[in-house]
């Protein structure tokens, strides 16, 4: 699989699915699976039976991984989804938003 150009801590926009249009920060990137975990997006509920550690039981809510193709980096200028290009500035490789030309990092 090619390099995803999405890193932990990036602000991203969800492009499709039940959370389309929502923005969040990338909490985890799983390049081998081609998935990302975005804070506050793609929440699922897991029902837990009562146990010794958790005698009450209950429902745990947490973010599930989603396919990396469903998210795009948010443009630093206007917050809309954009593609990312890698350019060399001052001898260092930096990620640049294609829409605005703004540097995403570095």
Curated annotation (Swiss-Prot):
The record's section on SUPFAM superfamilies has: Translation proteins SH3-like domain
Annotated TM spans = none
Q: Name one GO biological process term.
A: translation
A Pfam family the protein falls into: KOW
Q: Which InterPro entries match?
A: KOW, Rib_uL2_dom2, Ribosomal_uL24, Ribosomal_uL24_CS, Ribosomal_uL24_KOW, Translation_prot_SH3-like_sf
Q: Which UniProt keywords apply?
A: Ribonucleoprotein, Ribosomal protein, RNA-binding, rRNA-binding
Source species, domain of life: Bacteria
UniProt cross-references to NCBIfam families, sorted A to Z: rplX_bact (TIGR01079)
Q: What does the UniProt record say this protein does?
A: One of two assembly initiator proteins, it binds directly to the 5'-end of the 23S rRNA, where it nucleates assembly of the 50S subunit. One of the proteins that surrounds the polypeptide exit tunnel on the outside of the subunit.
Q: How does it assemble?
A: Part of the 50S ribosomal subunit.
Q: What is this protein called?
A: Large ribosomal subunit protein uL24
